[in-house]
């Protein structure tokens, strides 16, 4: 302990505190400070020390309580800023900080109701969206037959026009022979101009008589076409005059020639492919045969001697047999025989001379050996 000039005591305080977050208690922390106070330690002092050590926002994020004796055990006493903390021992304090929830259960209840209301509205919105989708689909279905009917009416109008032209031609062909004869008489009498004028009333009379038939045929044809277009939705109508079959190009003048050329090219390509495959297979077969052959080690250069007579190689252990069979040896032996025969001593007669002291007086022949 140390004394101060003011009479207070400076004590070293050991502060042990626990932090509890969402029901989980952390490992205890130890904080040692020097405290000068006559009245003890308050919670505001502890918060000041924790703010200096852990940050300004840390102490206010927890609710604090101290550990103290109670009867035969210990309890946690909740504290406020002005409460005095009772030590567990002489200069040791044990505190626990519980994390403060941001929202209380009372505040959560309206949020839950709001979420329920939102989910209900969301469900209502989903139902409204489904209804809107149904309405749009119905509108599309209603509009699409109108489009098809418009298209079908256009097609039926073209069909009816064609039918009218065909029927008019047919009616003109089926005129009465009397009217035709009258027209011919008029043409002979009045010329070409009067012929046209005489023909007009006949055409008008025939058309007026067949108007009922035309209307009836128009109505039947139109009804049949409308029904068919409604069944097809007007999207599958095609103009057969525009369609050109693909076989016409082949049936033309150049069709057979083109087919023959194509077949010839195909056969050429096929034969070339076959020849290439055959050559390639032959090369592969040769390579495989050469690969499968046993590889002979390169022979070492023989050290056998050469015969000086015939120039052939012979083994040293077979020298005698080679000498017997060698032609050069035989030839050399024959030459040696000739040489020996030529080098033999031949008696050579010389001129006789009289040897003095020979009473017989006959001549003595001196023989000398000469070597060639």
Swiss-Prot record:
It is found in: Cell membrane. Residues 178-195, 330-347 have a biased composition (Polar residues). Its main location: membrane. It comes from the Eukaryota. Expressed during embryogenesis and in roots. The keyword Membrane applies. Residues 149-168, 202-211 have a biased composition (Low complexity). 'Soseki' means cornerstone in Japanese. This is Protein SOSEKI 1. It comes from Arabidopsis thaliana. The gene is SOK1.
């Amino acid at each position: 302990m140390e004394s101060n000039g003011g009479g207070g005591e400076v004590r070293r305080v050991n502060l042990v505190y626990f932090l509890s977050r969402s029901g989980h208690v952390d490992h205890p922390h130890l904080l040692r400070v020097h405290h000068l106070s006559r009245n003890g330690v308050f919670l505001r002092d502890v918060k000041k020390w924790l703010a200096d050590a852990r940050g300004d926002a840390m102490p206010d994020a927890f609710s604090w309580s101290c550990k103290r004796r109670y009867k035969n055990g210990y309890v946690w006493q909740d504290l406020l800023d002005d409460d005095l903390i009772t030590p567990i021992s002489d200069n040791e304090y044990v505190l626990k900080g519980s994390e403060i929830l941001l929202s209380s259960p009372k505040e959560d209840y309206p949020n839950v109701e709001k979420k329920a209301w939102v989910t209900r509205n969301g469900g209502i919105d989903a139902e409204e969206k489904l209804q809107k989708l149904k309405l749009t689909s119905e509108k599309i279905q209603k509009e699409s037959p109108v489009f098809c009917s418009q298209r079908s009416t256009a097609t039926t109008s073209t069909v009816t026009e064609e039918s009218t032209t065909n029927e008019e031609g047919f009616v003109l062909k089926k005129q009465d022979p009397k009217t035709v004869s009258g027209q011919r008489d008029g043409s002979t009498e009045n010329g070409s101009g009067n012929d046209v004028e005489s023909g007009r009333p006949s055409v008008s009379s025939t058309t007026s008589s067949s108007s009922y038939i035309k209307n009836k045929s128009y109505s039947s044809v139109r009804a049949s076409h409308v029904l068919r277009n409604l069944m097809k939705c007007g999207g599958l109508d095609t103009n057969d005059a525009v369609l050109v079959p693909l076989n016409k190009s082949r049936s033309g003048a150049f069709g057979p020639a083109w087919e023959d050329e194509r077949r010839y090219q195909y056969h050429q390509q096929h034969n070339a492919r076959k020849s290439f495959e055959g050559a390639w297979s032959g090369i592969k077969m040769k390579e495989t045969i050469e690969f499968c052959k046993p590889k002979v080690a390169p022979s070492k250069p023989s050290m056998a001697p050469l015969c000086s007579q015939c120039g052939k190689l012979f083994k040293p252990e077979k020298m005698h047999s080679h000498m017997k069979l060698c032609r050069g040896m035989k030839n050399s032996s024959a030459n040696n025989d000739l040489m020996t025969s030529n080098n033999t001593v031949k008696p050579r007669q010389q001129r006789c001379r009289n040897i003095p002291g020979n009473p017989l007086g006959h001549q003595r022949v001196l023989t000398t050996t000469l070597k060639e």
